[in-house]
Amino acid sequence: VLEKYAELHEQPARLICIDYLELIRAYTDSQMAKVQGLARELKVFSREHDVAVVVLHQVKRGEANAGHKPLDLTDGKFGSEESADFVLGMYRPSMNPTINQDLRDSLDNDIRLQFLKTRTGGGIHPEGKQHYWNGDTGRISEIRF
């Protein structure tokens, strides 16, 4: 599909976002092998066509973390972390079920973005860097102090 798109359009794509990698067909026995193979192929495609590829993956969390705690690379492994140049995470402290409603309301627009993996290895801002989230537009912006 990506190769056909690249051939059909004069203006090359600069960014490709894939929301659900597991929906792409691959012929392997295991889901993990399928995802790892697709991740490698996407990385090669990205280099050959000089295009950024972003793969989104929603982490399934247990009841202990309803989306309010920082992530680490062991959360929701899906097979392509090893191939990724960067792994980003995000969470919303207001999702914490143990805080009172007033605190939850005060944190409603708080979203934390994490760099869990970079090209040089470890993460940056493991607790997440605070950003402003607009629930009406879905836009995330940096908080300036």
Residue ranges and their predicted role:
Residues 1-16, 44-49, 61-145:
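C-terminal regions of RecA-like/P-loop NTPase motor modules
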Residues 20:
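Walker B catalytic acidic pair
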Residues 25-36, 63-72:
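Flexible beta-alpha connector loops of hexameric P-loop NTPases
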Residues 29-45, 88:
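A short alpha/beta connector and helix-capping loop motif
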Residues 52:
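Residue-level detector of anion-binding/catalytic polar loops
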Residues 55-58:
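Conserved H-loop
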